[in-house]
Structures are given as structure tokens and as C-alpha cells.
């Protein structure tokens, strides 16, 4: 041991004197080793037993916050035993490499010994590490998370953590695709790298483990990666479908289930929107060729069994097929459930499997039920209540845009001509040697011979799935003047709608826009189509780049990736001349996006050449992950006198209902 004890010494447990040795002549109660729970120092970082990709240290996501307390008396050294790594689907470990549980009194406990091949470090050494980690909770350019917010978050903190994680992931994807990462940072899993950076910086929330709802996470929220759920405390396991902790009362300790993920790996019945038949974890998951072995009542299965007796609330996350990317899944938080019953039945491999019947608690907002309804509307198996038009675009869009009013008797918005292009656009000149690139087939990320990539400061603005990496002063896309193919990935804003949109009547803000599909942060939504005008005489159906807009940060923080800040593109837009677009007579779905002071959509100026001239376009992208049937909104901005002061006249009263509402817009 590092403390320098002699071979036959035993640490004393009291605060007493001198030698601190135990009197060996005293009779003590002896228990079998297997009945003893390991005693671990609070500040010790535990290592994970799961195997991770080469080049990645284990993740340590949840840890006990440092408390201001007097130095405790010497503790007995923790007992450690080796356990072989568990199978990926069996493992109850989270990104912290352990269950890191707490009892009902809020004390951190653990349910199993951890493997160790190195001598244990002293508490003093571990304490130094914690202090360093806590100093890094505030990240330059991103904002800080207090120690209290690390334990218990809120909506704003949860959004900040998710946006910071996703901005890092997008940047790492961009670097990976352009082959600019060195061998140390290079990885095919940018999400793991981003998660590791966030963990090392202590940038996370809801670390305090709890039964029931998680502060700042709302029913219906969507996640595109399990790591996202880990970093906001919704589900602490990056691989396992069952998350649990050890609860302690006066008589005993027992595992209690916190959350489950039903993602189709096991043979789960998920057809009913309020009932879920969940299969336990173990040997027999949906594989006919596996040797018949009964599942064991241990770890997550035992936690579910105990929770069925305790009748505690369990968070349920449903993994569903992404309607846009068929090979991916979207995770939707479906709220709180209780286990009504459990039983054992024969699985497909012939072994016994545990089954648990989860029943959703009443009075919660609909989540999975919304997905089920959308599925029926898309297949035509159920009629849409309040449907006025099946396709408002009359075939202009490749995906139909429905028009719905289930609020009142209004039959539709005022007449206009649907168009998905910009009319009467005014060209402007740039100091460029050419109006297009000479790439064969499609432009390739990292190819600095491509003139369009050069105009984007050497970065390909989008990653492979069409997600925008960063806000830029201008995004230079390939256009009709370029020699690359029309399906070039640098033409994202010219490819039309990718999600099925619906124009609907709101309760108090006229007509609005929403999507049948979940939308990932950075996804292109639509262009603002209409007529370019010199001056806006009216305030309705007008987009104006000269307005004053609230600043916000969306890009990754370069210091997290050890990049030089001076080489990073600013988020301030650079527009050669003001662009004003009216969609009153001609327009597309963008005209129906309402204003919000806390929007979920932002606009980005995009430039490409047509007919030997450059034209400016306004493209809209998702600011964060947007659940299906959520209204899409952006900041309309405020008018300006010309001397820098905002003009109150002509403004409209804001009804966005946001906690950050500024009262008016336009």
C-alpha cells in the first residue's frame, strides 16, 4: 500500500492515538468475505471493467460531489476482488465504470468489488484530482455549471450540456471525415471522444442518482445517442438497458431500478402506448442459435424484481427507428412507469427469460403515444383529425405538407402561391477567381484543391449526414456553376424538405409549423422562400437580415479540443448587403414559423453561384434536438432606427411564453 504500513499492521478505525493499531487479542465478530460490502473512499475515482475502444480511457460520468467536511478518521482499506468483464448487453455499468449508487440517505455506495491491477492510491492523491476536475467545471466560451447544478440540473443546464456535447461531436466528425486528426485523437467514434472530453472537464448535470423524474429532462425529449442520456442523468448506463442503484434502509440493502431502455435488442412487446412488456437482461436475447441458458436473477433483473415489490417509479426510454436514417435509432423519454407484474417464460433459445409488465402512470404528457399516432397517419391507417389539405404545397415539395386545424373552424390561411425558391434575388460580386469548383463527381472533405472548400476556410461545412457543423459568417455551397454532381454533399440547402411538415392552427398565434419526424440538431429544415424586396412596409411574412438579433453560442468551444481560438470561425454573420424577403404572396413552409425568444431553429446565410453571379439565401437549421409535433420557431429580431437603437413602434406583442421572453418582436 502507498501509505507505508508494515506487513503485519492493521489500520485502526478510531480517531485515537499513537500507533493506530488494532489489539489482536480482542475477540471480534467474523463474517465470510462474500458477505462484506467494500468500503470505498468518497473521492476515489473508480475504474471501469468494461472494455473500450483502443485509445480511450474508461468514462467516469457520475461521481460524488466534494463536500466541505473535517478530515475523517482513517478507514479500513477497501477489499477488492477480480471479476471478469461482463458481456456488453449484460453489463450494468455506466460510463462511470460502476453503478455508483446511493442509498436512501443520499450516501454513495457500490454493489460490487472492482478489479485492480495497481496499488490503491491514497485519499490525498485522489483529492487532488477532484479539485482539478472541479476547477474545470466552468469552460471558457461555454459557460459554467455550479456544483449544485452538477448534482441537480434544470432545463437550461440540460440544454447547455446537450448542445456542448453535440457541438464537440459534430466538430470531431468533421475532422475525422477530412482526415485531419492525428493518430492519438483519431477515432471512428467521435461520440465517444466527445463524451470523454466532457467527462474529463466535469461538464455534466444530474449526477445525483434518483428515483423518479430528472430535473430539466421533459417527457417526450429525444436523444440520438445513449451518451447524451448519460450526461444529463436520465439513464446512467451507456450499454446496459437497466440502470439501478442500491437502496439501504435500517434492515437491509437491495437494488432498485431507476430506468430502462427498450430498444428492440430483446424481445419486448412495445405496441401499447401505456403498457410495456420488458424482457430481462441475460443469455437468451432473441437469438435462436444460442445455447439454452436461463436468465439469472441478479444485477438489473434483481433490481427490477425488487422494484416490482417496492412499487417505485421507473423511468422508461423507448428506442425507435429513425424515420430519416433507417439504420439509426432515436431514444424518446416516455415518462414514469411502475412494474405491475413479473413472470418467467421460455425464450426463443429455449432458456427461461424474465418478463416484466410496466404500466405508465396516468396524467403524464403523451410521448410514445404521439409516435404511434404519427405512424398511423403516415400509413393511412388512421384519419387525421382536423385535416384540411393533404398537401399544401400542391406537389411542389417532394414530401407532402399537410394543413390541419383542430382548434376552431378556420378553413386555412390567406391565399398565396406556394414556391420553394427565391424570386427577384439581387446578385452581388465577390473577389473570386471562379464561380464554381472543378471537382469530379462530388466534393471530398479535406480536399483543399476544391475552390468551394477554400471559401469555407478549408472546412467542409457539413458532415456526411448533411448536418451543419458550425454557424459561419457565410456558408459557401456548391451551385449550378460547379462541375460536381448535383448530389454533392455541399448542396444541402438546395435539396428541399427532408422531413414531413405540417402547418397547423395554434391556440393563440395563428398558424404554425411542426414536423412529423424528430429533427437532430444542425439538420437543414428549409429555405426562406419568397420575393426579395427593398423595404418592408409591413411586418407580416417578412424576413429581414438588418434586424437586431439576440446573440447565442452554438459552435463548439475550441479550448475543449486544444485548438487555437484565433483560427476558429466567428459566429457573427457577414452579409454584403441587407436581404429582405417577403413571403406574403409567394413562399413556402418557412412563412409559417412563428417567433420565439427561446427558439429551436436558427437561420444561416448561404451563398452559391448561378448564371455567373452570386446569390444570397437564408437557410434554417435545428438549434437543438426537436421532438416530433413540436412547433418550430426562430427569433424574428427587432427593428433598428439606423443609429443602433431599437425601434419600439411597429413591434408586435410576443406570446412565445418563454421564461426569456423580451415582450415584443419585429
PLM-predicted stretches and their roles:
Residues 1-133:
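Extended, intrinsically disordered, low-complexity regulatory segments of metazoan chromatin-modifying
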Residues 89-95, 127-129, 133-135, 139-159, ...:
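Acidic, glycine-rich low-complexity segments with interspersed aromatic residues
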Residues 323-330, 532-538, 640-652:
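Short, Lys/Arg- and Gly-enriched loop/turn segments at beta-strand edges
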Residues 325-382, 626:
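Compact mixed alphabeta submodule
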Residues 335-346, 505-538, 621-640:
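Conserved SET/PR-domain catalytic core that frames the SAM/AdoMet-binding pocket
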Residues 359-362, 367-465:
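Intrinsically disordered, low-complexity acidic/polar tracts
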Residues 492-609:
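Catalytic cores of histone-lysine modification enzymes
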Residues 620, 628-666:
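C-terminal interaction modules of eukaryotic adaptor/scaffold proteins
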Amino acid at each position: 500500500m502507498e501509505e507505508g504500513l508494515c506487513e503485519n499492521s492493521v489500520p485502526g478505525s478510531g480517531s485515537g492515538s499513537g500507533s493506530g493499531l488494532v489489539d489482536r487479542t480482542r475477540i471480534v465478530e467474523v463474517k465470510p468475505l462474500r458477505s462484506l460490502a467494500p468500503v470505498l473512499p468518497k473521492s476515489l475515482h473508480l475504474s471501469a471493467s468494461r472494455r473500450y475502444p483502443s485509445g480511450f480511457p474508461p468514462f467516469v460520468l457520475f461521481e460524488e460531489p466534494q463536500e466541505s467536511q473535517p478530515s475523517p478518521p482513517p478507514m479500513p482499506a477497501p477489499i477488492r476482488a477480480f471479476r471478469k468483464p461482463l458481456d456488453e448487453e449484460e453489463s450494468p455499468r455506466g460510463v462511470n465504470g460502476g453503478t455508483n449508487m446511493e442509498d436512501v440517505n443520499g450516501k454513495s455506495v457500490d454493489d460490487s468489488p472492482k478489479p485492480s491491477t495497481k496499488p490503491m492510491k491514497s485519499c490525498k492523491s485522489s483529492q487532488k484530482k477532484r479539485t482539478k476536475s472541479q476547477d474545470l467545471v466552468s469552460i471558457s466560451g461555454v459557460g459554467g455549471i455550479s456544483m449544485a447544478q452538477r448534482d441537480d440540473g434544470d432545463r437550461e443546464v440540460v440544454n447547455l450540456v446537450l448542445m456542448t456535447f453535440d457541438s464537440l461531436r459534430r466538430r470531431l466528425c468533421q475532422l475525422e471525415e477530412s482526415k485531419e486528426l492525428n493518430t492519438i485523437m483519431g477515432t471512428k467514434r467521435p461520440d465517444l471522444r466527445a463524451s470523454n472530453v466532457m467527462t474529463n472537464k466535469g461538464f455534466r448535470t444530474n449526477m445525483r442518482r434518483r428515483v423518479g423524474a430528472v430535473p430539466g429532462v421533459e417527457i417526450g425529449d429525444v436523444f440520438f445517442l445513449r451518451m447524451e442520456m448519460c450526461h444529463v442523468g436520465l439513464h446512467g448506463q451507456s450499454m446496459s438497458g437497466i440502470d439501478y442503484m442500491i437502496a439501504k434502509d435500517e434492515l437491509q440493502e437491495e437494488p432498485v431500478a431507476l430506468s430502462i431502455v427498450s430498444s428492440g435488442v430483446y424481445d419486448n412487446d412495445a405496441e401499447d402506448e401505456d403498457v410495456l412488456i420488458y424482457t430481462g437482461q441475460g443469455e437468451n436475447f432473441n437469438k435462436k442459435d444460442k445455447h439454452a441458458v436461463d436468465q439469472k436473477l441478479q444485477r438489473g433483473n434483481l433490481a427490477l424484481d425488487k422494484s416490482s415489490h417496492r412499487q417505485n417509479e421507473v423511468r422508461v426510454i423507448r428506442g425507435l427507428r429513425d424515420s430519416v436514417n433507417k439504420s439509426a435509432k432515436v431514444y424518446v423519454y416516455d415518462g414514469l412507469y411502475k412494474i405491475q407484474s413479473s413472470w418467467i417464460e421460455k425464450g426463443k433459445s429455449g432458456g427461461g427469460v424474465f418478463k416484466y409488465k410496466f404500466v405508465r402512470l396516468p396524467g403524464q404528457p403523451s410521448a410514445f403515444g404521439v409516435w404511434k399516432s404519427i405512424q398511423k397517419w403516415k400509413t393511412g391507417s388512421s384519419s387525421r383529425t382536423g385535416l384540411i389539405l393533404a398537401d399544401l404545397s400542391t406537389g411542389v415539395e417532394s414530401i407532402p405538407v399537410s394543413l390541419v386545424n383542430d382548434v376552431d373552424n378556420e378553413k386555412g390561411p390567406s391565399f398565396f402561391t406556394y414556391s420553394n425558391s427565391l424570386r427577384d434575388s439581387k446578385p452581388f460580386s465577390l473577389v473570386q477567381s471562379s464561380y464554381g469548383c472543378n471537382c469530379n463527381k462530388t466534393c471530398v472533405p479535406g480536399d483543399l484543391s476544391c475552390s468551394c472548400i477554400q471559401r469555407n476556410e478549408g472546412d467542409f461545412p457539413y458532415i456526411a449526414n448533411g448536418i451543419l457543423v458550425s454557424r459561419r459568417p457565410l456558408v459557401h455551397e456548391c451551385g449550378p456553376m460547379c462541375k460536381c454532381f448535383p448530389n454533392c454533399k455541399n448542396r444541402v440547402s438546395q435539396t428541399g424538405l427532408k422531413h414531413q411538415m405540417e402547418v397547423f392552427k395554434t391556440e393563440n398565434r395563428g398558424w404554425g409549423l411542426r414536423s412529423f419526424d424528430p429533427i437532430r440538431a444542425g439538420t437543414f429544415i428549409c429555405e426562406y422562400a419568397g420575393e426579395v424586396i427593398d423595404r418592408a412596409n409591413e411586418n407580416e411574412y417578412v424576413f429581414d437580415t438588418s434586424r437586431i438579433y439576440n446573440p447565442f453560442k452554438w459552435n463548439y468551444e475550441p479550448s475543449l479540443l486544444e485548438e487555437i481560438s484565433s483560427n476558429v470561425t466567428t459566429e457573427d454573420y457577414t452579409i454584403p448587403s441587407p436581404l429582405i424577403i417577403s413571403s406574403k404572396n409567394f413562399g413556402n413552409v418557412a412563412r409559417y414559423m412563428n417567433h420565439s425568444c427561446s427558439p429551436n431553429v436558427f437561420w444561416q446565410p448561404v451563398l452559391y453561384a448561378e448564371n455567373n453571379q452570386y446569390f444570397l439565401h437564408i437557410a434554417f437549421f435545428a438549434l437543438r434536438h426537436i421532438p416530433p409535433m413540436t412547433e418550430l420557431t426562430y427569433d424574428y429580431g427587432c427593428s433598428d432606427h439606423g443609429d443602433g437603437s431599437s425601434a419600439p413602434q411597429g413591434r408586435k406583442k410576443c406570446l412565445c411564453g418563454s421564461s426569456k421572453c423580451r415582450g415584443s418582436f419585429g
